[in-house]
Swiss-Prot record, chains A, B, C:
PANTHER family: URONATE ISOMERASE. It is an enzyme of class 5 (isomerase). HAMAP family: UxaC (MF_00675). This is Uronate isomerase. Gene3D superfamilies: Metal-dependent hydrolases, uronate isomerase, domain 2, chain A.
């Protein structure tokens, strides 16, 4: 059965007619604002090389763990979905993999994935019928053709999407060659990097030792000495800032921070290098490094992002065969009040530091995060993240944080995605949900419509620019 | 004051007129579907013997901890409510107990109990005025009379309620005589059992040793040896399957699982039998047994249900005098991410195993359970349970699980009740709430109405049949 | 830009027209009921001395941590906001501080603070334009003038606000002189005290030793002996009851209770006095004292309130400079099920005891608190507290507790404030939110409108009077 694909202009607005009218007006003032994407995981090589994307499966399905984890949960093997394993590329025929997705679209009913996909199918590729078993081949063929045309190259899409700024995320061991190539090419698209040092901080990461060696090579520092190790961080941060970075990012299992003496920090570092360390040692080192990163941020001005609370690689069998980031990362209960205290005791009242905190544990929104951000000058709240980057998730974020932290201790939207084509769809969802939330406040006479308009624009555009220091004169020439 | 009793046809639908219209249409397509009740606690003797229920108090009040715990919380002694104690039957006159309920109906405003009761009073008994102090006797008399008529016998009600299948829950030490008698009687009602081995697994259960003896007698196994004990489980599972069982059920204090070596499991079992064991030993044994049950399910195909997180018998004084299941079980914070890992590491990627997980800790819906069920092939989410089997509770379940797990990693509704007459009321509430939730998605243009119709039918009928393997050809002849 | 200030008559009601009509009717029956304020932190000296309040900054901003913490979170130093430090009064000019607030009102969009302020500005001071940078001086001047007039003295406002009863909160070491003076003055306003013994119970409180000495002086007891210490509590409780107290209040870091033997309690007390104690000792002592307080309540009839779960003075630097209660108290995850068990095992089934429990951890509403209060005769649920005393917070409280605990295990509203002028605003918000919640139940046909009217009046007026024993014949002459 073939069904029409329609992106209703009122989608995601509250159903009540009066509230919807207000939402429509608020959304009208933000829908065409440029996209600021200050945190995400697109591949800089796309913009450096500007090569065409290969086909629908390799564009949409194989890299998107939101999609293939859902199919996997219903018993479809990853090998049939185009997902590469440690042994090499997937044995699946891309067209067959695409058909598998197409015939299981009912699994995504009520999920953000279906909204994002339909947005892309309708807005970017112009489809007017839904993806289904019947239309799988039509989709696969038309998408394949389109991708060969110049209008669907990464840079062309970047411009078409009205992206004012896009940040990627790299490891300190990345030589930033794609960012350099982009700049050398003279292309005007503003793509910057962000400093994510987890591989050289997390001693439990499978690549820790190899990353550390590479870290030493790139910086010429003795990274087996504590002072050399810290100096290497300073150098790579500076190098990242030359490629436009205004932020760092830290994806630790918990939000723990520590504030050890120099001697204790040094001894701990030596212990980690000896490889004779416990999980508690590794945790304490990650905790200490957040405080070290904060100290460096006070010097160089980089905004810190903390993304804690994911139990990575939960599925042992899958990890052994397919490696990381395969949809098997599961959120855990996360404490902030005790975890952040050492860092806050040291730097919480600094006005020159900015730390953006995220959570996968919504129970902390009203209980911990809004009260912390509503008090400490250094703290801001990142938007609803990952599993919660969804209509209901975003609504809960606003409902549970606004009354204590207000809107102005939040930082606007992050798409946080490597699904490049979904970026406009994701920002559009955020703008619609914020418009709907503000519209409810207006309809309940808790906020004037004038104030709501101003706030809507701030959430969509001004707050991310300010929070990520994107409108400040850059400290390094290259960031302009 | 006497007030009319009205069951409004639009009850529980969202108030917004447009959304309500959609909900009405969706509900229309499911309201008359047969009831599938794959998990509950009705007494098989009712259907085996088909004896009349005694009176209103003994039918509604004395066995329903939802009702008497609320009266108890306001200072009414259980002895006045018909609730039996360990010393014997209640000293209360049933009519007096009924009057006590009737004159306190305001306590139930806004609770599901009042909706369930009113549904039964109106739909099953035809009352058109509300229960109150003034109408207490009228109710007591009319219900008493009705219960003597053939139309109110258990089997007649079963048929009138349009129940396609009803599962009861029995201990391994139950000889299943009522199920056997039912089958022998030639009655066509499909009532099956389910295997709930807690009394022979939980060494802290007050009947553990006695249950174990009985377990040995029934199976002829040496249940004091580890292999004999496991073999006894296999034999009782097979016997339960002969009485139609398609599932097991496990009501542990936590969701902990373990995967011990054979030697360690055996040693632990011996320790428990020595009675010289710690609470941690008992917990580890329950954890190990979940993994053992999963292993057996891979062989015999029974679906596992895990109902963790209730702190049983919290009120020490009440437990001493009245025993278990007296409304004093309190939910606790429950971890799933670490707890389930040992079992999932062993069997999480099996396609021949199905584990349905429940929770009393709603904070785990979006954080842990939806991400786990949205990834692992073996996991499905049971519906909102116990305290959360209520309009707001069900809404939160859908709002917090759908965006990550979708609808198709859930299993439809369980009434989980021993209040037989409330079964249609409870399924009706679930169908109305799901219709309302789907209607909101349609009204917000997040789902087409066609897809919503299909999903509504799946939630009400197809998913429970599939999840509990009720439409599969049975592996044992008796289950047909 | 100057904008009109309007308090819309329908504010906070649900947007749906039909539901709003019902809410309007329900609110109509409660809006003019007298205010019962059984728990709060106003200063009894205001009513004893009836001196005029000084100016807008000292009335609104400097004492209100909701306001200045938000400004502080955005980088405004407390010294610029009129907040006194340990070193003495604030160096800020009150008018300058007021301008700082006025020009940052956008920070409060969507927060209850903005609703409360606007209510006071509009209803109490008659402003018809919003506070902003442009109107800061106008506001400061007009408020300053008004405060000098007799109509704005504390007692006149008390009467204008239609307050039937107001409870303040004092330490056992307070000599209650202001309460005595009030009574001696012949003023008819009913202002009573409440017994908050934290400073003589919490050995980690910075004033513990000094408070203990004062406690001994006031009572003439040897408070370094366990029996003398307990006797001193009994005496101060009696003295508080003479000043109208009907309740005690306990603000511990957790909800832990204990039930030690006499010998163990005595030994623990000696250890605390030796000053050679661990945090765990201090915690155990607080836990034991809750049980001791319950035992005394059984004798003297005082209602217990437990307000647990705040991590006090989280910001070490701020605490060192400005002291306690400066907006740096952060909620923590709070367990009730295990924490309350020792007290409940001892006294949970008493009908002569009443314990009102509060939480800052909303995840405990549906999981722990509603099930506990829906079972134990001694337990009632306090209203949404502190960070959750807000429109969304109150809604969540009702949505998450009503289905299990009903309305009648809750105790109506507490304003819990030291912002005297905001008391009518806060009660008005609570009445509107409850009207809106009840209206939704009526609109969804879950409650009749007659029952909703009765319930609305109970929540606004009857339940607080009953729960705090304000309509019982007093046991002491002074309480009448």
């Amino acid at each position: 059965m073939t069904r029409p694909l329609r992106l209703h202009p009122d989608r995601l607005f509250p159903a009540d007619a009066g509230t919807r009218d207000i939402a429509r007006r608020l959304y009208g003032s933000v829908k065409d604002l440029p996209i600021i994407s200050p945190h995400g995981h697109t591949d800089p090589e796309w913009f450096a090389g500007d090569a065409p994307f290969p086909d629908a499966t390799n564009l949409f399905l194989a890299p998107d763990h939101y999609l293939y984890r859902m199919l996997y949960s219903q018993g479809v093997p990853l090998d049939r979905l185009g997902v590469p394993s440690k042994a090499g590329p997937s044995p699946a025929d891309p067209r067959e993999a695409w058909r598998m997705l197409a015939s299981n679209m009912h699994l995504f009913r009520g999920t953000p994935s279906s909204m994002w996909l339909n947005h892309v199918f309708g807005e970017v590729f112009g489809f007017e019928i839904e993806l289904s078993a019947e239309t799988a081949d039509l989709y696969f063929d038309r998408i394949g053709e389109a991708l060969q045309s110049p209008a669907f190259r990464p840079r062309a899409l970047f411009e078409r999407f009205n992206i004012e700024l896009l940040a990627t995320t790299e490891s300190p061991t990345d030589d930033l060659r794609h960012h350099k190539a982009m700049r050398a090419s003279g292309w005007k698209g503003r793509v910057v990097t962000a400093y994510r040092p987890d591989p050289v901080i997390d001693a439990e990461h499978e690549d820790f030792r190899a990353s550390l060696s590479r870290f030493g090579e790139l910086t010429g520092q003795d990274v087996e000495s504590w002072s050399g190790y810290l100096q290497a961080h300073r150098m790579r941060r500076a190098a990242f800032m030359e490629m436009g970075a205004t932020s760092t990012d830290h994806g630790h299992p918990t939000a723990a921070t520590a504030d050890l003496s120099l001697a204790d920090a040094e001894a701990l570092f030596r212990k980690l290098l000896s490889a004779d360390f416990s999980p508690a040692d590794a945790e304490l080192f990650r905790a200490q490094m957040l405080t070290e990163m904060a100290r460096m941020s006070l010097d160089d001005g980089l905004v810190m992002q903390i993304h804690p609370g994911s139990f990575r690689n939960h599925n042992a069998g899958l990890f052994a065969r397919y490696g990381r980031d395969k949809g098997a990362d599961i959120p855990t209960r996360t404490d902030y009040v005790r975890a952040l205290k050492p860092l806050l005791d040291r730097f919480g009242n600094e006005r020159g530091l900015s730390v953006i905190v995220f959570t996968l544990d919504e129970s902390s929104y009203a209980r911990e995060l809004a009260p912390l951000a509503g008090h400490y000058p250094v703290l801001k709240l990142g938007p609803a993240w990952w599993f919660h980057d969804s209509p209901e998730g975003m609504r809960r974020f606003r409902e549970q944080t606004t009354e204590t932290a207000g809107f102005y201790n939040t930082v606007g939207f992050n798409d946080d995605t490597r699904a490049f084509l979904s970026i406009p769809a994701r920002h559009d969802v955020a703008r619609r949900i914020d418009a709907g939330f503000l519209a409810r406040l207006v309809a309940e006479h808790r906020l004037s419509e004038d104030d709501a308009h101003e706030t809507a624009v701030d959430l969509a555009y001004n707050l991310p620019k300010r929070a990520y220091k994107l409108d400040e004169p850059a400290r390094t020439p290259a960031a302009a």
